């Protein structure tokens, strides 16, 4: 990136700054989150036309809602393999169903209450990241696993029990 910046400055190439192509951190503004504002919470996990979605999802955070969670450092190391199950997908209405999150932590319960915008953003990232990771794993399994040996079960979660405390 540094070399690119030097070359652009040296050649005096004009640029326009675009701030709406990518989303990454649900807690901050200034990203492409405005593209999601008109989508109802109950539909945030549904497929929308690509033209209405952020172009890039930067997977640099942990995403959570209810007990649904995805974090790249917590993802099992052999996730892309023949043996590993696929990630269990959250319900399509996850952003209208939950307003808080319980993060997976073996030592203590970490509970977070989320604001209205955060719920929609976390729901979007959670659904679409899990879908993308599963698609990558399925592609690997289809291409590299012997017939009948790949695990296509959607059963991998980060909590042993997916029930929220008020559901117990």
For every predicted segment, state its role.
Residues 78-168:
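Juxtamembrane luminal stem/stalk of type II transmembrane Golgi/ER carbohydrate-processing enzymes
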Residues 34-92:
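Polybasic, proline/glycine-rich intrinsically disordered low-complexity segments
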Residues 1-55:
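Catalytic core and acceptor-binding pocket of nucleotide-sugar-dependent glycosyltransferases
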Residues 32-35, 69, 126, 151:
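Polar low-complexity intrinsically disordered regions enriched in Ser/Thr and small residues
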Residues 1, 13, 53, 57, ...:
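Detector for methionine-enriched segments
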Residues 18, 25-27, 67, 143, ...:
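Generic marker of "main functional regions" within proteins
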């Amino acid at each position: 990136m540094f070399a690119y910046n030097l070359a652009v400055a040296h050649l005096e190439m004009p640029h326009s700054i675009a701030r709406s192509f990518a989303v990454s951190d649900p807690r901050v503004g200034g990203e492409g989150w405005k593209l999601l504002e008109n989508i109802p919470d109950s539909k945030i996990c549904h497929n929308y036309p690509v033209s209405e979605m952020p172009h890039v999802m930067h997977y640099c955070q942990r995403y959570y809602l209810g007990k649904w969670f995805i974090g790249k450092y917590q993802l099992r190391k052999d996730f892309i393999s023949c043996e590993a199950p696929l990630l269990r997908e959250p319900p399509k209405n996850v952003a209208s169903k939950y307003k808080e999150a319980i993060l997976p932590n073996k030592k203590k319960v970490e509970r977070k209450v989320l604001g209205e915008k955060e719920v929609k953003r976390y729901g979007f990232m959670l659904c679409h990241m899990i879908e993308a990771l599963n698609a990558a794993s399925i592609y690997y399994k289809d291409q590299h696993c012997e017939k009948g040996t790949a695990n296509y079960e959607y059963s991998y979660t980060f909590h042993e029990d997916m029930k929220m405390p008020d559901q117990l």
